[in-house]
Amino acid sequence: MSHTPAPASPEAGPEPARSTSEGHLTVGDVVALVEAAAPPGLAASWDSNGLICGDPAEPVRSILLAVDPVTAVVEEAIDAGVDMVITHHPLYLRGTDHVAATDPKGRTVHRLIRAGIALLNAHTSLDAAHGGVADALAERVGL
């Protein structure tokens, strides 16, 4: 897991990133940057990618990166005071009809929302993206 400050003015994608009055990117800006690098159209039909919870208008000052959106990651995000968590694997792989706090995934969503933390995941879209996970692994093993 990695805790990194969000860039103030990234140079990615065809449109310049917007920012809040304090100069921070917004949740929506970060989503757009991730989707520019890993377009949702590249995702497998069975996969779930995108913004799981969070207000696109909220500022993002810091981001926690992780592989899975598990309880330990949520606790680390809350303790670190980050505004957003980006994971590779999705919280919900299939559609859901509830987010009650009576099950682990529902509790995760509730904890994130109460803490004001957005959750974004990019799974197979990032795997398939040019320069993404598959390309990086292929390069590493010499393919």
Give a label for each model feature.
Residues M1-L143:
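Hydrophobic structural segments
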